[in-house]
């Protein structure tokens, strides 16, 4: 059964995003990853069973693996502790919430989030590939030796990359956060420094690249390529910490080492079945989204569970 909405009486829900419902607990937040799925920035009416659990359990796994690189916002994800905390806040009949909250919920520190998405790419794909192609097409051809380098948001890249190619070094390509229903806008590191200040921008860039390096080395040992991913950071007092989700199929492109072949798009462990089906019915990319057929739901749920199994090494 998919859980697509939550309602906890006696608590103030401060955010209902594409996937997560967030409740205000005073100094802390209660974050529930539902089974909602969005495609083309539209939330679908059908949920994907276990999706929220996969996102939460994978984030917990990565929080633990990367905590020596950067602190994170987690206080607890233990269901008994969460229910006890809710009871202490006057929420009635907390046991009835166990099934809804179990495995998909965290209590976290409340951080002031930076208004940027920290994107790191080890391979060229998605919006970066589209931008790279446009820039390359506008370059004058050079004599004899093909085109020169392409400068993407201030980063010089070779002029002969193909789609899904591994980049010489991972690159940091931040984006501005969009309102619900809009697309994030890619920006340069210099523009990010203007928005949040140079010192913080430097920390965010360093932490992003360091977490990616550690995570991609681990993932490679499990036969998974992390092509790109995005992180969000926040500040608690003087400390900069990682918040939201980390290295999940919703925030990252995971590819299978076995099937990786540059020169086109790669199959990934995410909502590709949903996107493909929507394109096949000529979905107009405007809300409301259509109900998803059972096979699309089942295949997508399997992909999310497989991502967890491949990375963590056990079943969800």
Feature roles, as predicted:
Residues 120, 226-246:
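Conserved metal-phosphate-binding beta-hairpin within the catalytic cores
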Residues 53, 57, 199, 203-210, ...:
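Generic recognition of stable, solvent-exposed alpha-helical segments in well-folded globular domains
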Residues 113-115, 223-226, 237-241, 252:
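Coil-to-beta-strand transition motifs
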Residues 138, 246-307:
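C-terminal helix-cap and adjacent tail motif
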């Amino acid at each position: 059964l998919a859980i697509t909405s939550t309602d906890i009486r006696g608590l103030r829900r401060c955010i209902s995003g594409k996937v997560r419902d967030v409740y205000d607990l005073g100094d802390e937040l209660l974050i529930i990853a539902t089974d909602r799925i969005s495609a083309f920035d539209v939330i679908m009416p059908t949920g994907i069973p276990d999706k929220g659990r996969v996102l939460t359990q994978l984030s917990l796994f990565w929080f633990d693996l990367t905590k020596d690189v950067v602190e994170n916002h987690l206080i607890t994800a233990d269901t008994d502790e969460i229910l006890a905390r809710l009871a202490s806040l006057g929420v009635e009949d907390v046991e009835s919430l166990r099934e809804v909250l179990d495995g998909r919920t965290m209590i976290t520190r409340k951080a002031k989030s930076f208004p940027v998405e920290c994107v790191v790419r080890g391979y060229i794909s998605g919006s970066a590939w589209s931008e790279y192609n446009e820039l390359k097409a506008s370059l004058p051809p050079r004599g004899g030796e093909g085109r020169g380098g392409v400068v993407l948001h201030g980063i010089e890249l070779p002029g002969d990359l193909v789609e899904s190619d591994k980049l010489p070094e991972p690159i940091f390509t931040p984006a501005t956060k969009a309102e619900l229903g809009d697309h994030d806008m890619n920006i340069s590191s210099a523009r990010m420094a203007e928005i949040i200040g140079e010192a913080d921008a430097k920390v965010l860039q360093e932490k992003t690249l360091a977490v990616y390096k550690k995570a991609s080395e681990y993932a490679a040992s499990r036969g998974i390529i992390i092509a790109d991913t995005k992180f969000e950071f926040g500040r608690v007092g003087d400390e900069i910490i990682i918040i939201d989700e980390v290295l999940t199929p919703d925030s990252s492109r995971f590819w299978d080492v076995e099937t990786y072949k540059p020169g086109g798009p790669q199959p990934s462990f995410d909502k590709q079945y949903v996107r493909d089906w929507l394109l096949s019915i000529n979905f107009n990319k405007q809300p409301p989204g259509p109900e998803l057929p059972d096979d699309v739901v089942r295949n997508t749920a399997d992909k999310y569970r497989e991502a967890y199994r491949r990375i963590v090494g056990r079943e969800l």
